Amino acid sequence: FPYTTLFRSEGIKQHAAHEAVTHHDVKAVEYYIDDQLDKAPAELTNINDALKTLVHFACTSEDINNLSIARCVKNAMENVWTPAFKEIIDHLAEKADQYRDKSLLSLTHGQPATPTTLGKELAVYVYRLGRQLKRIENQEYLGKINGATGTFGAHLAACPDVDWIAVSREFVTNRMGLTWNPLTTQIESHDWQAELYGTVAHANRIMHNLCVDVWMYISRGVFAQVPVKGATGSSTMPHKVNPIRFENAEANFEISCSLLDTLAATLVESRWQRDLTDSTTQRNIGSALGYSLLALTNLMGGLTSIHPNDAVIERELDENWEVLGEPIQTAMRACELKGLPGMDKPYEKVKELMRGHEISQDDVERFIDGLAFDAETAARLKALTPATYTGVAAKLVDFDR
């Protein structure tokens, strides 16, 4: 019988009826399978009783559940969550390359700082997320099938001549497609789950940081949003185009992280050979990953609806010539080492000129002309502008992955 044929709405009702009596989910499934074997096609009649005897043979419930959960999570991660995650990384990498030369005023502590490029800032996220992707792609998904306390006791009592360790290893590895865990109590220890959920939560938090950064870039005018025709930003302010996709992503990442953190903390502990806290906790795996997936969808929608606002970016750079204080005072230090006069206390001299003042290009050039720089250094410094003072930011994009 195909699973989809057996377990439709009527099957769910039958299973629920069994569980109402057993108060045990796996035992109810066992009885449900027995019911279905009674209805098997005529050609199976001669072996129905034998099949029913073998249902749940020598197994504890966790032998069934740990394999089912591991396969479900593995399938969800490999076929649903990770492709969506990769899509985010690929999009960021594409934009990092596209904007590698687009100068951008940095803000440290919310104040103007050494310029960077938009591409380099996006590449930072590509690199951070790529490290988490590698961990997720290398994640092991463990499983076990070894009886009530992990000793194969019932197996040997029934069939002592069978190499149950080899059977268990082959079944978990080749039939289930999981990594065999040879040493467990009644439960598979769930350490792989804690590792995975910790990594997904880490990735969530990096992307939450990205959402906040982009939100603030939009607020600052660095990114412009593409209005969606027919959409409403405010019920009373018709002009509004709100960054709701990033805000929704933030919220869903936060909910996902709270669930993932609970899963990772709870699942690594079990009283002696087992207690039931892990069973209840694992019922929230789908929600934890689902909220993250919803956040990924919102984030991708937001990223594809923004573009750099060149006018704002250029204006910010042109209004903050004081950021050239750093290269000037650093060049003064180098010249002081060469023995050039008037280069003492370089930091303090530049600070006196620039801190708390509006500085123009003329102010910078006059300051440079007033010092005893050699001609080459003076020319190099006077050629700098806030837009060109980006170091090797563009080249660093090549290291994003």
Question: Predicted regions span which residues?
Answer:
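Short, well-ordered beta-strand elements within core beta-sheets of diverse protein domains
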Residues: A76, K120, A194-H202, I328-K338
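A structural signal for well-ordered alpha-helices, especially hydrophobic packing surfaces
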Residues: E30, L37, P41, W81, ...
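A structural signal for small-residue-enriched, beta-sheet-centric alpha/beta enzyme cores
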Residues: S61, L156-P160, R175, W180-I187, ...
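A helix-coil-helix interface module used to build multimeric assemblies
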Residues: F1-H155, C159, D163-T173, G233-S234, ...
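Acidic, glycine-rich loop-and-beta core segments that form the ion-binding/anion-interacting portion
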Residues: D161-F253, C257
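Hydrophobic stripe of amphipathic alpha-helices that form coiled-coil interfaces
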Residues: A40, K95, Y99-K102, I136-Q139, ...
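Amphipathic alpha-helical coiled-coil segments and their boundaries
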Residues: K74, W81, L122, S189, ...
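Glycine-rich cofactor/substrate-binding loops
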Residues: H18-H23, G221-F223, S234-R401
